């Protein structure tokens, strides 16, 4: 299982939200490039970045910082937040992003997902952010009536290979992930599932690994010191090729 440390960008700084609430944001680092380098030094093989300004406005706002991170760390980066059209996807993949995450756009525009998957295959991921099992969009400000499992199955039919699942009620809380919903999703589809939201300690990561999930995104637990990234990667990868 791969562990993806998270960088959430707002106005060029690393911040963390609580339950997806932009008003409850806290700056955790002034220099995202320094943070990314530290993640790499601690053994990260992949980094998860969200452009929170982009998620709110519908267009990428922190591209210069993101480009600098890619050039500096030289390990794969996946990016979400404000990606709403194929031109933006083209631009990001051209800039060196390894995997582009579509969230709101995937729910509002199935045609875009089809086009993107046809062109970029596994470089496209779908971010499914759920509240009470319903898919949320527009920076988590709006909750749809669509069930997260139904949506995941629909994305899989289109050809999506990677799904990032976040239970919003758990995100940034350090109260543990929603293992029940995660397991239900992982058993319902054949895509690579990446767990996100609420992971508080190494035991949570072990619980996710037992489900044979592809990956886990860890944010607040690293910044708060609850999880030592280097130790976590070693423990999770011990005796396992996945």
Swiss-Prot record:
Upper taxonomic lineage: Bacteria, Bacillati, Bacillota, Clostridia, Eubacteriales
Originating gene: hisA
This protein's UniProt keywords: Amino-acid biosynthesis, Cytoplasm, Histidine biosynthesis, Isomerase
Enzyme class: isomerase
GO MF term set: 1-(5-phosphoribosyl)-5-[(5-phosphoribosylamino)methylideneamino]imidazole-4-carboxamide isomerase activity; imidazoleglycerol-phosphate synthase activity
Pfam families tied to this protein: His_biosynth
GO cellular component, as recorded: cytoplasm
Main location: cytoplasm
Active site: residue positions: 8 (proton acceptor), 129 (proton donor)
Annotated pathway: Amino-acid biosynthesis; L-histidine biosynthesis; L-histidine from 5-phospho-alpha-D-ribose 1-diphosphate: step 4/9
Protein family: Belongs to the HisA/HisF family.
Name of the molecule in the record: 1-(5-phosphoribosyl)-5-[(5-phosphoribosylamino)methylideneamino] imidazole-4-carboxamide isomerase
Organism for this UniProt entry: Clostridium botulinum (strain Hall / ATCC 3502 / NCTC 13319 / Type A)
Catalytic activity annotation: 1-(5-phospho-beta-D-ribosyl)-5-[(5-phospho-beta-D-ribosylamino)methylideneamino]imidazole-4-carboxamide = 5-[(5-phospho-1-deoxy-D-ribulos-1-ylimino)methylamino]-1-(5-phospho-beta-D-ribosyl)imidazole-4-carboxamide
EC number: 5.3.1.16
Record's subcellular location: Cytoplasm
Alphabetical GO biological process terms: L-histidine biosynthetic process
């Amino acid at each position: 299982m791969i562990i993806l440390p998270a960088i959430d960008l707002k106005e060029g700084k690393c911040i963390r939200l609580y339950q997806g609430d932009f008003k409850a944001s806290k700056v955790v680092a002034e220099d995202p490039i320094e943070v990314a380098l530290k993640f790499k030094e601690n053994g990260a093989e992949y980094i998860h970045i969200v452009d929170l300004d982009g998620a709110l406005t519908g267009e990428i706002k922190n591209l210069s910082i993101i480009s600098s991170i890619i050039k500096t760390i030289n390990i794969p980066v996946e990016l979400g937040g404000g990606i709403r059209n194929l031109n933006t996807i083209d631009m990001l993949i051209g800039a060196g992003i390894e995997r582009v995450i579509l969230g709101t756009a995937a729910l509002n525009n199935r045609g875009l997902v089809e086009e993107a998957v046809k062109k970029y295959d596994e470089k496209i991921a779908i971010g499914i952010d759920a509240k009470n099992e319903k898919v949320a969009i527009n920076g988590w400000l709006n909750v749809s009536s669509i069930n997260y499992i139904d949506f995941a199955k629909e994305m899989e039919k289109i050809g999506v290979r990677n799904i990032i699942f976040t239970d919003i009620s758990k995100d940034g809380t350090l109260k543990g992930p929603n293992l029940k919903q995660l397991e239900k999703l992982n058993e319902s589809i054949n895509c690579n599932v990446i767990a996100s939201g609420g992971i508080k300690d190494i035991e949570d990561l072990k619980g996710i690994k037992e489900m044979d999930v592809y990956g886990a995104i860890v944010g607040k637990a690293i910044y708060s010191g609850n999880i030592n990234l280097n130790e976590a990667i070693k423990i999770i990868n011990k005796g396992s090729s996945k």
